[in-house]
């Protein structure tokens, strides 16, 4: 389901632990890492889609997390044409996402990447809050930065800024 502009409605999930580190998932049979995310089905609310995707991709249930906040508006990214399925070319531009910031209230052992028959991730780790901005695939980078900035400024008081984090990184990591 695409909107009139060619964007697929989607939710993104930033899951943090008690140290404000983020869940970073390794895609099945790939060397790429990303936050959990997935499409919103027709008639489904963003929050319902978020809980469904959280279970499908991470194996966590609502009792394992607390919603800290969400982005105010949709954040969009365009997918390069060579990444778009042939049958979608011409109509599909990318994703529009509502991002949720969740705090893990359960334990690390509650994470189950094999909760469904079609896992999205085959590995995961806790990562520094800002590190995914520099590690995610290029076309998602701006949306990751925008989501992390908005959610940290509104809901995580005292969080180091991305600019301060980036200034401390070796120049080869940016």
From Swiss-Prot:
Pfam families: NUDIX
Essential cofactor(s): a divalent metal cation
Keyword annotations of the record: Hydrolase
EC number of the protein: 3.6.1.-
Motif (Nudix box): 38-59
Functional description taken from the UniProt entry: Accelerates the degradation of transcripts by removing pyrophosphate from the 5'-end of triphosphorylated RNA, leading to a more labile monophosphorylated state that can stimulate subsequent ribonuclease cleavage.
Protein name: RNA pyrophosphohydrolase
């Amino acid at each position: 389901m695409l909107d009139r502009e060619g964007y697929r409605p989607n939710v993104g999930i930033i899951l943090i632990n008690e140290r404000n580190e983020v869940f970073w998932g390794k895609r099945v049979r790939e060397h790429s890492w990303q936050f959990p995310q997935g499409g919103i089905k027709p008639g489904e609310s963003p929050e319902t889609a978020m809980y469904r995707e959280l279970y499908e991709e991470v194996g966590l249930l609502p009792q394992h997390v607390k919603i800290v906040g969400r982005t105010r508006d949709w954040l969009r990214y365009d997918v390069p044409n060579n990444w778009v399925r042939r049958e979608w070319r011409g109509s599909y531009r990318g994703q529009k996402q509502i991002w949720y910031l969740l705090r893990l209230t359960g334990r690390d052992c509650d994470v189950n990447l094999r909760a469904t028959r079609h896992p999205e991730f085959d590995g995961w780790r806790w990562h520094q809050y800002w590190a995914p901005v520099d590690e995610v695939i290029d076309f998602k980078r701006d949306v990751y930065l925008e989501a992390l900035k908005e959610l940290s400024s509104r809901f995580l008081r005292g969080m180091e800024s991305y600019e301060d984090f980036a200034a401390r990184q070796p120049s080869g990591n940016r």
